[in-house]
């Protein structure tokens, strides 16, 4: 799937010129397209866990039951895929990354989100804090389906959606920025949709 997915020639549909919610080069999508780099992992909840590790004073790990017992938030956000579709007012429920990092002491400036299926993506730590990111477990009032990243996915709606890693299992805090899966194949290191940061050099 990676060969077909990575293409500068993807043109998408015509952008509604009067819609200020659409970043440059995007079109509004009513559905929720499924794009993945490989087969959909299906991890039983009794085997699922989530960890914060790396450049931290002490690693932290939660089982599914412990994770679901953490305070969660309902959020409504627009999302923007690098393949040029945007979906407005998507409703999620998830645990704020701020909650997962509460009490963590670190000098790290970056994070690698690692996921089932050997997927990773890299982000500045500041883009996951300050109420800007969640680990989401529900979408539109229902448990998050595996094809959309369930049982839990990272949700970083202010960046292109590949940064919201599906099937997330942990956050590794690092001193240096380490390119993730798509970033190593030519996607932009940051991925701001309003600056059209899709690929290297954008």
What function would you assign to each model-found segment?
Residues 2-202:
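Structured, non-membrane catalytic/scaffold regions adjacent to prosthetic-group chemistry
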């Amino acid at each position: 799937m990676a060969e077909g997915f990575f293409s500068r020639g993807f043109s998408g549909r015509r952008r509604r010129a009067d819609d200020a919610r659409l970043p440059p080069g995007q079109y509004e999508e009513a559905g929720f397209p499924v794009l993945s780099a490989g087969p959909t992992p299906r991890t039983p909840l009794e085997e699922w866990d989530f960890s914060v590790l790396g450049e931290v004073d002490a690693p932290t790990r939660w089982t599914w039951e412990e994770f679901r017992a953490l305070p969660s938030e309902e959020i409504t956000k627009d999302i923007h895929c690098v393949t040029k579709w945007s979906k407005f007012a998507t409703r999620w429920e998830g645990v704020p990354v701020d909650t997962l990092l509460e009490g963590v002491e670190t000098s790290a400036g970056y994070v690698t989100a690692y996921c089932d299926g050997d997927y990773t993506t890299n982000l500045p730590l500041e883009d996951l804090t300050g109420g800007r990111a969640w680990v989401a477990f529900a979408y539109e009032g229902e448990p998050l389906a595996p094809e959309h990243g369930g049982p839990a996915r990272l949700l970083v709606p202010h960046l292109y959606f590949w940064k919201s890693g599906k099937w997330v299992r942990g956050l590794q805090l690092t001193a240096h920025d380490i390119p993730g899966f798509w970033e190593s194949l030519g996607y932009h290191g940051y991925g701001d949709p309003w600056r059209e940061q899709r690929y290297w050099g954008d």
